[in-house]
Amino acid sequence: VDGEKMSKSLGNFWTISEALKNVDPLVLRYALINAPYRQPVDFNQVMIDDSVVHHGRLVTCYGEGLAKNGSSDWREFSWLEKATSRFESGMDDDFNTRVALVEVQSVAKRMRGLLDSGGESEEIAGAVCWISEYAGGVLGLLPEDAEVLRNMKRQESAKDEISQRVESLLLQRNNARESKDWARADEIRDELK
């Protein structure tokens, strides 16, 4: 832990139940799968924070692709065949999960590009199926599809609420400025920061 040996006497250890209280189990799995291959795991907060970010990106990208409701066989796309080969090569190398995870992230990155550019829906659907099979099925890094979609809807409604609140505050601020109520306009400006 943080470059030191984990021990009770140093007070720098976590039990599994403590770790699961503090960290989402899938994020913890992501962190451990991403640990350097054949080396001791230096478990620290930076490792967890990085895993929260990268796992979140993976799940978000997967969810956005899943929401497209397409269906396609990923084997139709040569780039996914190549990713599969590299993934399996890493796993065949004494379960080098870090190499496998790099392939999962590369597929997610390419899928993100397709989503952002309005790419082929069949290709996006193929990438979704690939990620489901390899990141979800093999590595166990994805929540259930229904949970992913539920969380996306919750996030969208939260974004809408924030957007409506900001618009309301901007309108109030403009009204305060028009009526030369500078104190109220400044107060609203500070709230918007």
Predicted regions and their residues:
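Structural preference for alpha-helix termini/caps and helix-kink/transition segments
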Residues: 5-7, 11-193
